[in-house]
From Swiss-Prot:
Subcellular location: Cytoplasm
Named cofactor requirement(s): FMN; NADPH; Mg(2+)
Top-level enzyme category: isomerase
Keyword Magnesium: yes
Subunit structure: Homooctamer. Dimer of tetramers.
Alphabetical list of InterPro entries matching this protein: Aldolase_TIM (IPR013785), FMN-dep_DH (IPR000262), IPdP_isomerase (IPR011179)
GO BP terms: isoprenoid biosynthetic process
Protein name: Isopentenyl-diphosphate delta-isomerase
Gene that specifies this protein: fni
């Protein structure tokens, strides 16, 4: 029974990557909102472009630039090579890496190496384990979660919140009752920091405060504007069941594009942290449609500590341009810092940025 469950999960993980790489699954009803913001130009930056420092700190770890390779994959055969390449890039650029959902590793042993490969390939950078909110709500034990952390020698645990994805997923788990209480139990007992992450619909400031109260140390907003996991699962549903309708046609488009834009998540949480000092230490990751280093720079100025990307970097990996893409993004970021007079990423946090009229 366990191996059957593990096989089903592995097949789903493979399907997810295939759909994300080959089907039109990005939001088309709204964007990240980052394009609505512009930096104030500094015509006398008083810094040397060659000396701009991209290094940053995240959850106590020094990193090479404020970018994370976001949670994408693992738990099936082909994922081993993908995760090895992603981890090697993370190590080369000294940036964090999150693995995809590790549910399959709890269901069977067949593809555990697709996860464990990341630590052997990236021995010195922060790596984060990953499990879903439905599994947490269902009562995963501290021991089970510790097993996932130990498997990849993780520096933290990502708990992904994905109600819209689960709603659309043919095999979805839609019982989230008791999640916040279970989350609090986990953060109080597990020996690594916990990150709460959406998968593309965003996290509001009120929810961020509840998650922080439950003990999470960081929020990955994963806002609307990048991949719509509703669209990913709708593709899989239609492939399996044809055009059998689940939702009213007049409502479906809004559901497929449901979510809070990334920039709106960032500004909301920044306002929360400014208003309520008890949330001041909450780290923030900007993800959901991050396309380049300028998006990273805007994210930092809008309140994020780092940004993260999944699909863009996975597509670059497939094209053989992963490291070139990361270098280009670093140069984008450096250019934005130069033109705002920000010699460090800490200074970039205070760079003037305005909503376009």
């Amino acid at each position: 029974m366990q191996e059957t469950s593990a096989t089903i999960t592995a097949e789903r993980k493979h399907s997810h990557v295939d759909v994300c790489l080959n089907r039109p699954v990005c939001f088309d009803g709204q964007d990240t909102g980052l394009d609505a913001w512009r930096f104030e130009h500094n015509a006398a930056p008083e810094i040397d472009f060659a000396e701009i420092d991209l290094t940053a700190e995240f959850l106590g770890h020094a990193i090479g630039m404020p970018l994370m390779i976001s949670s994408m994959t693992g738990g099936y055969g082909d994922a081993l090579a993908l995760n090895r390449t992603l981890a090697e890039a993370a190590e080369r650029f000294r940036i964090p890496l999150g693995v995809g959902s590790m549910r399959q590793a709890l269901e069977g042993n067949s593809h555990r190496e697709s996860f464990s490969i990341v630590r052997s390939s990236a021995p010195s950078v922060p790596i984060f384990a990953n499990i879903g909110a439905p599994e947490v709500a269902a009562g995963l034990s501290r021991e089970q979660l510790s097993t996932l952390v130990e498997l990849i020698e993780a520096d933290g645990l990502i708990v992904h919140l994905n109600p819209a994805q689960e709603l659309f997923q043919p095999e979805g788990s839609t019982n989230f009752r008791g999640f916040l209480d279970r989350l609090h139990d986990i953060t109080a007992t597990i020996n690594v920091p916990v990150i709460a992450k959406e998968v593309g619909c965003g996290i509001s400031a009120p929810l961020a405060s509840k998650l922080a109260d439950a003990g999470v140390k960081a929020i990955d907003v994963a806002g609307a504007g990048g991949i719509s996991w509703q669209k990913v699962e709708e593709c899989r549903y239609l492939d399996r069941f044809g055009n059998e309708e689940r939702f009213s046609p007049s409502a479906l488009d809004e559901f497929l594009n449901w979510g809070i834009p990334t920039a709106e998540c960032l500004t909301g949480i920044a306002a929360l942290k400014e208003k309520s000092p008890e949330y001041g230490s909450l780290a923030v990751i900007s993800s959901g449609g991050i396309r380049n280093g300028l998006d990273v720079a805007k994210s930092i100025a809008l309140g994020a500590d780092i940004a993260a990307s999944a699909q863009h970097l996975l597509k670059a990996l497939r094209a053989g341009t992963l490291e070139e893409t990361i270098r280009t993004w670093a140069n984008d970021l450096r250019a934005a810092m130069f033109l705002t007079g920000s010699a460090t990423t800490a200074q970039l946090k205070h760079a003037p940025i305005y909503r376009k009229p």
